[in-house]
């Protein structure tokens, strides 16, 4: 299913199958663009999931945001790390609340969440368990 279907003003044009797993991973660009009101990007995700549900989708894997402060774009200072990790936590909290609401509203929806935030924190705390050695520095000093 294309994003064009999700953005269509004609929901009947969208067809989804109940047996397909729909993976939803979004929000980082909103935070990169300075969004601090998490209801905006989470609301957009909710609308997209609702459209897919209306079109027939029933199985979803929703991936939360990693701690964006640890990404090369933001790991230059402790202040920036803290700011973007906090924003990621705020987004993830709003996302979890929204997903719980969808589960309550739709008894036939299967919503599973992949907690990437915790996975990244686990890798930073115990890099050897993941076969990693340096989890704090950027791999490249190049500016994109």
Where in the sequence are the language-model features?
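Extended low-complexity acidic/polar segments
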Residues: 38-43, 48-56, 128-144
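Stable alpha-helical elements in mature extracytoplasmic
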Residues: 1, 41-49, 53, 84-87, ...
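Loop/turn elements at helix/coil->beta-strand transitions in domains of secreted/extracellular proteins
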Residues: 17-22, 54-61, 106-112
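A sequence-level detector for low-complexity, Ser/Thr- and acidic-rich stretches
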Residues: 61-63, 90
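Mobile gating loops/cap/lid regions near enzyme active sites that modulate substrate access
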Residues: 67-85, 89, 97, 101-104, ...
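Residue-level preference for long, well-ordered alpha-helices that form the structural scaffold
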Residues: 11, 34-41, 77-91
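Helix-boundary and membrane-interface capping/anchor signal
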Residues: 49-50, 54, 63, 100, ...
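Oxyanion-hole/transition-state-stabilizing segment in secreted/luminal serine hydrolases
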Residues: 2-39, 58-59, 66-74
